[in-house]
């Protein structure tokens, strides 16, 4: 946002809480854009509060609803003007096409559609078929994503190798109360932080069911390390300011049997711990006794 919009003379300011959004509004402000839950820390914002703030100030409000999906969250009913989705993810659900979607007020959609048509943003017929196929099972898939992610988050929260779990469905999540008010389910995305960040790569290569990959929202479970992938272009200081540390791992929880998923995480975390321990021992200088 900062690097692209500023090239066109559009200023950007950042906020996290409703009070910070109020304070950030100036006479030049035209639009409020939020992501809830956010990537990769799964933070949630008060959508109803921001929707009302936008109406009072005469601002367009936009939310990225990709992580939640329409099954779990309805921002238009909470006062937002435009809802965005990466249709590549949960809406399609099969990891075999690319598209995006904007849903909202008729006048705004007319303008967006006209611009999209002028710039060539139209899906081909086969991609439309793939999207329609995915939408037919969206509600069914999301129920399983929700259930599996809830169970996996609870397991990880109790694991000794894990320092923190970020999932809005957990009572200890900082935005659990907000998420409970505005979400019908807490989604299939979570992230967790290892106590020892040096174990990240050892854990990553030990999975048998889960696939190390950057995408999300498909039938299969995927895991990635944001510091090495989505946020790799940021400096370590910039990542730390966002709460993205080297030991953070993001999971797109699929619809596999939950017992298989939990077993895979249990094995990978233990194998990663053993591998890291062996590496530390082998790196110690040898001693010779006479």
Region spans (language model):
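Conserved PLP-enzyme active-site core in the AAT-like
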Residues: 1-161, 166
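A common structural junction motif
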Residues: 120, 207-217, 268-276
